[in-house]
A protein has these predicted regions:
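Sec-dependent N-terminal signal peptides
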Residues: 4-14
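M16 family metallopeptidases and their MPP-like homologs
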Residues: 37, 42-55, 64-65, 82-175, ...
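A common structural junction motif
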Residues: 175-182, 274-281, 392-404, 627-637, ...
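Proteolytic maturation boundary segments
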Residues: 19-33, 262-301, 338, 343, ...
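Active-site recognition of the HExxH zinc-binding catalytic motif
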Residues: 63-71, 75, 564-572, 784, ...
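Carboxylate/His-rich catalytic cores and anion/metal-binding grooves
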Residues: 193-200
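Metal-associated gating/positioning segment near the N- to mid-region
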Residues: 60, 72-84
Length: 961
C-alpha cells in the first residue's frame, strides 16, 4: 500500500484507488479509466482497450455500425499507415460523399455506377497509404493474439506483448484511437459480408435470431450484432464516423493491462500517451420497454437439426443486487460438477439434455432454460415438447418451494468460489473481469465482495428469488426440425486495392526509434518439474502451485479410441457413473462436491484422462473416492440409452446437414481416405448393441496401460509421492503404450480436386492440402518463419491477398501441421471460407501464393522479432507446465525450445524463408477440396485451370450404418 500512496503523491494528475492488493484503478483528467493488474507469473502483458459502446447504441436504421467500426479500426490513422495524408484525404472525403449518395439511391444501375466510382477512389486513395502497417507494428514488438470483439454493450481491442515493449504498445494504441482513417472501407464491407455468410451457415445463428427477437422484443438486444441484411447492403461511412466520434471518447473508454509489468513504470507512460484524448459529453441512452410475456406466449420455428425447448423469464440488469442470486439459482439447476436439479434429470435419462443460464446485460436480463427432449432409441422418436416442459417445470418448482437439499446449496457455493479463484490464474480472464466491471459500472470490489455474498446465500434467498422471477409469465420457444431461410449475397464487380510495398509512414519510423529496455532472457527450466517412478510405467510429474490452495491432478493412461473405440461411449458413462454396489451417480457427484472437488473423464485418439481439481487439504479423500469410482464403476442402462440416443440422433439428423461437420468429414476423407474418423468408426448397429458389461470392461482394460500422473499443488514432493502411491488406482506390470498415434496421411502423386455439392450452404469451403516431409526440431525455426511470413495473423500473405486486397473471405488460413513425434510427416493445410460465386477467384489467388509466392524482404525484421518474443513468451502456465515439458521431451528437446532456437532466429535471413518455400511448398501436388453450391461455383473454370474434378457424395464420407 505504501507504494500506491507514493504513486499518488508523484502523479497528482490522476486519481488512484487501490481497493485491494490485486489491481490498481484510476482515471485520467479526461475521464479515461485505467486498470493495472501486476501478475509476475505471466510471461508477458495482456493489453486491451474497451469502449462502453456496442450494437445497442446504433441507430435502428443503420445496424451493424459497431461491428463495422471494429473491423476498420485496424486500418490506421492520419499517422499510422499514412504515406501522404493530404493527398489521400481528397479521395477519402470523396468516398464518404459517394457512400452518402449511394445510401440515398435505389436505382440498381445508378448504385452499380456509384460502386464503381467508390472502387476507383479507393484504388487512388490506397496509393498514399499502407493499410496493414498497424498490424505490422504490433508484430514488430513481438505482439501476438491481435484481435477485437463487438457485443451488445461493449467493444474491445486487445493483444499480448512483451513487458519491455510497454511504451511502444501504449504509444501505438493511443495513436490508434486518436484520428482513425477507415481505409479500404468498400473492401472491408465484403469481408463483413463473408462473416455474415459464415454465420448464416450455422443453425444456431437462426435459432438465436428467432429466440432473441421475442426474448428481447422492443429492445436493440433483439437484433443481431453483425447487423440486418438490408443495412449491410446499404452502408454509410459518414454514419460510421459519427458513431465513432460520439462513443469512442476517453470518458467512455478503459485501458487494461494485466501481466508481467510494474505499475510505477506504466502510470507515467499512460498519462503521457493518453491524456491528450479529448473528453466529450456522452448522449443519454434511451430507455426501452420490456417485452410482453403476459399470458405465457409460445412461438415455434422449423430451424433445428433436432427439437429443442427454450424457456425465458424476465430478470434484471447485471448491475442489480439480485444478479448474483439469480446466477446462484442457475447453478442449482446446472453446474460443472453435475450436481444440479437439471443435471440429475439428464443423468437419469428423463431428457437428452437440460441446462439453465443467466443472461445479464446492461439494460435488461433473462433467465434461460434449454432442453432437448428424450430420444427413444428403439422407436427413434423424441418425447413431446409439452412433456419435456412439464419435467423442467417440476424441477423449477422445487427451487420455489425450497425442496432442495442443503448439500446441493453448499455444493454450488464451493463450486462458484473455486471457479472464481481459478479464473484469475489467467491474464485474459483477469482482464475480462476488469472489462466487466468497467462496462457495467460495477463496484471496483465487486468480485472480492461476491465471494462473501455467495458464502452467505440461504435457502430463504433461493425461494425469494425464484418465487419473484421464475413464477408466472414466461416465454416458450419450440424449435422443430427444418431448414432456415437464408439471405443470398452476390459478388460485387470491384477491382483489388493495391498498396505500396517496401515503405512506411513517418509514424512507423518514429515508433521504431522509441528506445526499449535491454532485458535478460528468462528461459523455462525443466528442473521446475520433479519426477518419480511409482512403478515401472507409472510416472509422477510434480509442479508447485504458487497461487492458491486448489490442486489439479491428471491421470493420463496410454491408450485412446484409436485402439479402443468403445472408450468414447464408456467415458461418457463414467461422467455419470455410480459406485458399486449401491451408490448412484447423484450420490457420487454429491460426495465429490462435499469434498470441494470435481472429477471428469475424457478421451482422445491417444489417451484416456481422469482430471481432478479440488481443495488441497482434501487431496487424500478425493483420490480415494476417484479410485473407487474407477475400479468399481456402476454404469446405468438408462444412461447408456441416453448416450446412444444422442449419437444415433446426431448421425441421422445432424452430421450430414451441418456445414461444418460436412467440411470436416470431407477434409478427413481427403487426408485419410477410409481411415477418416467419420468412416473408420463404430457403426450405429454396433453402438446400439453396446452392453454395460462391455463398457465397464473397457474402462478397466484402459487402466492397464502406462500411466503419467501430473500433479500441481502445494504439498511437498515427498508427501505427494507417498500419498498418491497409496491412494490412486495404480497397477504393476502395465502395458507399454503405443501413443501418441500418428495417422498416416495420403500423398497425392498429381494435382487433385475433390468436390462435394451442397446447394444449402451460403459459403463455399475451400481446403488446400498436401503431405509434407518428416519433422525434426532442427527445422522448427524454418517452419515457423515460413508460416509467419505466409499466413501469420493479419500480416501474412494469405490474409493480405485473400482478405485485405481481394475481399474474398472473412476467414483464411494456412500452415503446416506438425506431429507430436520426430520423424513423422508434417502436412500443409490451407482454408478459405467464401461465397460460392467467389470460389474460383479465391482458388486462383491461393494457388498463385503457393506456386509463385510474392517476396517482401522488408518483413524479415518484424518476423524475427515476433519469433524471438513468441518463444520467450511461450512459457506454459504452472497448471500445464509438466504436460508441455513432457511433450517437448517427446519431440527431442532437452532444454527450453527458446534457448535451443535463439541463435538460429538471430541469424535468420529472408533467403532462408525462400529456400524453405522452394523445397517444401512450391509446385507440390496439391489436393484442392471444395464444398459449395454447384449451380454457382464456376466448376468448368476450375477444372480447366487445375484438372479433373472428382465429385463426392455424403455417402462416401461417412460410415455405412
Amino acid at each position: 500500500m505504501k507504494k500506491i500512496i507514493l504513486i499518488c503523491i508523484i502523479y497528482t494528475g490522476v486519481v488512484i484507488n487501490a481497493f485491494s492488493t490485486d489491481f490498481v484503478t484510476y482515471q485520467l483528467p479526461n475521464g479515461l479509466t485505467v486498470y493495472l493488474w501486476e501478475d509476475h507469473n505471466q510471461p508477458s502483458v495482456y493489453g486491451s482497450v474497451v469502449f462502453r459502446a456496442g450494437s445497442v447504441d446504433e441507430p435502428k436504421e443503420f445496424t451493424g455500425l459497431a461491428h463495422y467500426l471494429e473491423h476498420v479500426l485496424f486500418k490506421g490513422t492520419q499517422k499510422i499507415g499514412a504515406l501522404d495524408w493530404q493527398k489521400e484525404k481528397v479521395h477519402y472525403d470523396n468516398i464518404i460523399s459517394l457512400y452518402d449518395e449511394y445510401a440515398e439511391t435505389t436505382d440498381p444501375q445508378k448504385r452499380t455506377e456509384l460502386e464503381k466510382k467508390i472502387n476507383e477512389e479507393s484504388i487512388e486513395a490506397a496509393k498514399y497509404s499502407f493499410t496493414n502497417e498497424f498490424s505490422n507494428l504490433v508484430q514488430s514488438i513481438g505482439g501476438d493474439g491481435l484481435n477485437a470483439g463487438t457485443s451488445y454493450d461493449q467493444t474491445v481491442y486487445y493483444n499480448n506483448f512483451p513487458a519491455f515493449q510497454l511504451e511502444k504498445w501504449l504509444d501505438l494504441y493511443a495513436e490508434r484511437f486518436e484520428s482513425p482513417v477507415f481505409r479500404t472501407f468498400q473492401a472491408e464491407l465484403e469481408n463483413v459480408f463473408e462473416e455474415y455468410n459464415m454465420y448464416e451457415d450455422m443453425n444456431m445463428t437462426h435459432i438465436r435470431k428467432f429466440l432473441f427477437s421475442y426474448l428481447y422484443a422492443g429492445h436493440p438486444y433483439s437484433r443481431e450484432i453483425i447487423g440486418a441484411y438490408e443495412h449491410l447492403k446499404n452502408p454509410r461511412l459518414s454514419k460510421l464516423i459519427e458513431f465513432y466520434n460520439t462513443w469512442y471518447v476517453p470518458n467512455n473508454m478503459a485501458l487494461i493491462l494485466v501481466g508481467n509489468f510494474k505499475t510505477e513504470d506504466a502510470i507515467p507512460l499512460i498519462e503521457a500517451k493518453f491524456s491528450h484524448l479529448e473528453r466529450k459529453t456522452l448522449p443519454e441512452r434511451p430507455v426501452y420497454t420490456e417485452a410482453d410475456f403476459s399470458n405465457n406466449p409460445k412461438f415455434s420455428a422449423k430451424l433445428g437439426y433436432s427439437p429443442m425447448v427454450l424457456l425465458g423469464y424476465k430478470t434484471v440488469p447485471i448491475k442489480h443486487e439480485d444478479t448474483y442470486l439469480l446466477d446462484f439459482c442457475a447453478n442449482l439447476l446446472t453446474n460443472s460438477m453435475q450436481t444440479g436439479l437439471l443435471d440429475k434429470i439428464t443423468m437419469e435419462g428423463e431428457v437428452q439434455y437440460a441446462g439453465a443460464t443467466l443472461d445479464s446485460r446492461r439494460d435488461q436480463g433473462r433467465f434461460l432454460i434449454q432442453a432437448v427432449p428424450y430420444y427413444d432409441v428403439n422407436q427413434r422418436l423424441y418425447e413431446s415438447d409439452k412433456a419435456t416442459e412439464k419435467i423442467i417445470m417440476h424441477e423449477i418448482e422445487k427451487l420455489k418451494q425450497g425442496n432442495i437439499d442443503d448439500w446441493l446449496i453448499e455444493s454450488v457455493k464451493s463450486s462458484m468460489l473455486r471457479q472464481n479463484e481459478l479464473m484469475i490464474e489467467n491474464a485474459r480472464s483477469k482482464a475480462g473481469l476488469l472489462q466487466t466491471i468497467f462496462v457495467y459500472q460495477l463496484p471496483e470490489n465487486y468480485y472480492r465482495s461476491l465471494a462473501d455474498k455467495i458464502k452467505a446465500v440461504t435457502k430463504d434467498d433461493i425461494q425469494r428469488i425464484t418465487q419473484q422471477y421464475l413464477t408466472g409469465n414466461h416465454l416458450t420457444i419450440s424449435i422443430e426440425t427444418g431448414k432456415p431461410k437464408k439471405n443470398k449475397l452476390t459478388k460485387p464487380d470491384i477491382k483489388p486495392v493495391e498498396q505500396p510495398q517496401g515503405t512506411q509512414s513517418e509514424y512507423a519510423t518514429r515508433f521504431k526509434s522509441i528506445p526499449v529496455i535491454d532485458v535478460k532472457s528468462v528461459y523455462n527450466d525443466f528442473n521446475e518439474v520433479k519426477h518419480a517412478d511409482l512403478y515401472k510405467g507409472v510416472r509422477l510429474h510434480y509442479t508447485v502451485n504458487p497461487l492458491n490452495d486448489y490442486f489439479s491432478l491428471t491421470l493420463r493412461y496410454g491408450v485412446g479410441t484409436e485402439k479402443m473405440p468403445m472408450l468414447e461411449y464408456a467415458v461418457q458413462l463414467m461422467n455419470s457413473a455410480g459406485i458399486m454396489p449401491v451408490d448412484d451417480a447423484q450420490t457420487v457427484r454429491r460426495r465429490f462436491s462435499e469434498l470441494n472437488a470435481s472429477c471428469t473423464f475424457s478421451v482422445t485418439d491417444d489417451y484416456l484422462y481422469i482430471n481432478l481439481i479440488g481443495s488441497e487439504e482434501k487431496l487424500e479423500e478425493i483420490c480415494r473416492l476417484m479410485t473407487r469410482l474407477t475400479l468399481l464403476p456402476k454404469l446405468d442402462d438408462k444412461q447408456k440409452d441416453r448416450i446412444i440416443g444422442t449419437e444415433i440422433s446426431y448421425r441421422l439428423m445432424t452430421e450430414t446437414k451441418d456445414a461444418n461437420v460436412l467440411g470436416n468429414a470431407l477434409l478427413d476423407y481427403v487426408r485419410y481416405k477410409d481411415k477418416s474418423d467419420y468412416i473408420d468408426r463404430m457403426t450405429l448397429t454396433e453402438i446400439f448393441g453396446l452392453k454395460i458389461s462391455e463398457l465397464t470392461g473397457e474402462i478397466i482394460r484402459a487402466t492397464d496401460y502406462e500411466l503419467d500422473i501430473h500433479y500441481v499443488g502445494k504439498k511437498s514432493f515427498k508427501e505427494v509421492v507417498k500419498l498418491l502411491g497409496e491412494n490412486l488406482p495404480l497397477k504393476e506390470g502395465v502395458k507399454t503404450t503405443e501413443s501418441p498415434f500418428v495417422k498416416e496421411c495420403v500423398t497425392y502423386d498429381k494435382p487433385t480436386i475433390y468436390f462435394l455439392p451442397n446447394k444449402e450452404v451460403q459459403q463455399a469451403q475451400l481446403y488446400f492440402y498436401f503431405n509434407g516431409k518428416p519433422y525434426s526440431i532442427d527445422q522448427e525455426v524454418d517452419y515457423n518463419a515460413f508460416v509467419e511470413y505466409f499466413s501469420g495473423s493479419f500480416n501474412g500473405l494469405v490474409m493480405q491477398e485473400i482478405r485485405e486486397k481481394n475481399s474474398m473471405a472473412y476467414t483464411a488460413s494456412a500452415g503446416f501441421r506438425k506431429p507430436p513425434l520426430p520423424g513423422k510427416n508434417t502436412y500443409f493445410l490451407g482454408y478459405i471460407g467464401t461465397q460460392s460465386d467467389k470460389a474460383a477467384d479465391a482458388i486462383d489467388i491461393f494457388m498463385r501464393l503457393l506456386n509463385n509466392m510474392p517476396q517482401y524482404q522488408e518483413r524479415i525484421g518484424d518476423i524475427k522479432m515476433y519469433l524471438k518474443q513468441a518463444y520467450l513468451s511461450g512459457k506454459p502456465s504452472f497448471r500445464n507446465k509438466s504436460r508441455i515439458f513432457d511433450d517437448w521431451l517427446k519431440l527431442g528437446y532437452t532444454d527450453d525450445p527458446a534457448k535451443v532456437h535463439m541463435d538460429k532466429i538471430d541469424n535468420l535471413q529472408f533467403s532462408d524463408i525462400i529456400e524453405f518455400y522452394e523445397q517444401n511448398v512450391k509446385n507440390q501436388n496439391v489436393a484442392i477440396v471444395i464444398m459449395g453450391d454447384p449451380k454457382i461455383i464456376d466448376l468448368k473454370r476450375i477444372e480447366t485451370s487445375y484438372g479433373k474434378i472428382t465429385k463426392l457424395s455424403t455417402g462416401k464420407l461417412f460410415s455405412k450404418e
